Amino acid sequence: MIIDAVLNLVGKPYLPGVKPSLAKLPTDIKIVDVGTGSGCIAITLKLEIPEAEVTAVDISDKALEVAKQNRNKFDAKINFLKSDLLERIDFKPDVVVANLPYVDKDWDWIDKEALSKEPEIALYAGDHGLALIKRLIDQITKRAIPFLVLEADPCQHEDILNYARKKGLEKLETRGFVITLSNPQVSH
């Protein structure tokens, strides 16, 4: 789970009794949630790490409107920005989290009927579902951002990790659908 991975980075494990295994960051960090959708990840991170500055970005006006409505329900102090990935972010975050579209339309094993309830822009990506993830990894390395926590299908993890290594990122952890990457060129 993305939330658990970020809490692990700041030494605040989500589950009671679990020792943090990464604990590399203070809690007053800047977090950007790329592809925020409904805002649930950004909202939960802000509620779990109140001292963090959380910015939620999405390319969809409709998604941002839903995320703002959800933020208001929880009174979470979150910034919102319409942006194609990190293009309009004018500061350096400590952590970027992303649950981007990663489904390949050619996958014959997915339940297309179940997915039909979601907007296509929130589900599908080209390049075997990796197009947006690769663009984000490129932006992470170009901007020297210390950490990236992202969700992808486990069948994609090897390709993502190989691409990330070519770009200079290192795997800190994979758990379920979540990959945590570190940029060793940046002091943490």
Task: Name what the model sees in each region.
Residues 1-50, 60-66:
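SAM-dependent Rossmann-like transferase core, predominantly class I methyltransferases
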Residues 36, 58-61, 132, 152:
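Short beta->alpha hinge that forms the Motif I/post-I loop of the SAM-binding pocket
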Residues 62-73, 135, 162-163:
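Short alpha-helix adjacent to the SAM-binding motif of class I
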Residues 74-85:
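Conserved SAM-binding strand-loop segment of SAM-dependent methyltransferases
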Residues 85-92:
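Short conserved loop adjoining the S-adenosyl-L-methionine
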Residues 93-99:
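Short SAM/SAH-binding signature in class I
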Residues 100-132:
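Mobile active-site "lid"/loop adjacent to the S-adenosyl-L-methionine
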Residues 127-183:
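Conserved Class I SAM-dependent methyltransferase catalytic core
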